[in-house]
């Protein structure tokens, strides 16, 4: 097997598994940036999406000022292409993590991108829930946190679905960040593949990204179906 790789994928073989330019390191950095960015941006996006619904006209906590601010912040970050967001937030990344390059620096703009995208997805999901369920909870004297629980439990299957979409989008943005210095599979594909005309490296990097996305999609579909059947 090793001899076959060495013969037909010589550049892939030369890179090895470990080390700064190894495949294992690249995969780890891609997953590291994806997971950490989603934890940070996903949490903020969930909270923002929830409050976009709660403070909207006719919402449980109707508040035009809060809704307007959240709506505009989300729209601004959604409107800026990610490659530009990387450049714009570079000074902020340096302020937060002490550097403007590398995986830790990339997590800052990635988190902002996830926040805006996921907030809109959550808003759409929760806004489409049956209003009668929320009204029934209010009529029974439910507290604020009880109502939040109703929103999240009723919308859980669709929240899993939009989480899947967000993660898939994030993997692509992580690869884009890698191409401009953050490391990971994107960096391997461009720096060690495309720029050096090592087509086997570029192709394998692409296949790895596709496999990661397929894995996320499979898990997301599985959880969505399972939770939908329970509900």
Protein language model regions, located:
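Short helix-to-coil transition segments within interhelical loops
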Residues: 126-155, 195
């Amino acid at each position: 097997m090793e001899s076959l790789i060495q013969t037909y994928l010589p550049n892939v073989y030369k890179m090895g598994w470990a080390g700064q330019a190894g495949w294992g390191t690249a995969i780890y950095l891609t997953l590291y940036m994806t997971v950490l960015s989603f934890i940070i941006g996903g949490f903020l996006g969930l909270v923002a999406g929830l409050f976009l619904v709660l403070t909207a006209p006719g919402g449980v906590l109707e508040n035009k000022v809060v809704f307007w601010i959240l709506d505009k912040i989300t729209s601004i970050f959604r409107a800026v292409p990610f490659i530009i967001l990387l450049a714009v937030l570079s000074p902020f990344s340096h302020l937060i993590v002490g550097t403007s390059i590398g995986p830790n620096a990339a997590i800052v703009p990635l988190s902002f991108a996830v926040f805006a995208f996921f907030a809109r997805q959550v808003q759409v999901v929760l806004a489409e829930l049956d209003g009668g369920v929320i009204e029934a909870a209010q009529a029974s004297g439910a507290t604020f946190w009880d109502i939040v629980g109703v929103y999240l439990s009723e919308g859980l299957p669709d929240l899993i679905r939009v989480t899947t979409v967000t993660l898939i989008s994030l993997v692509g943005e992580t690869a884009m960040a890698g191409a401009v210095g953050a490391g990971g599979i994107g960096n391997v594909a461009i720096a060690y593949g495309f720029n050096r005309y090592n087509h086997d490296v570029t192709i394998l990097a692409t296949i790895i990204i596709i496999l990661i996305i397929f894995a996320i999609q499979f898990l997301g579909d599985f959880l969505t179906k399972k939770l939908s059947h329970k509900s």
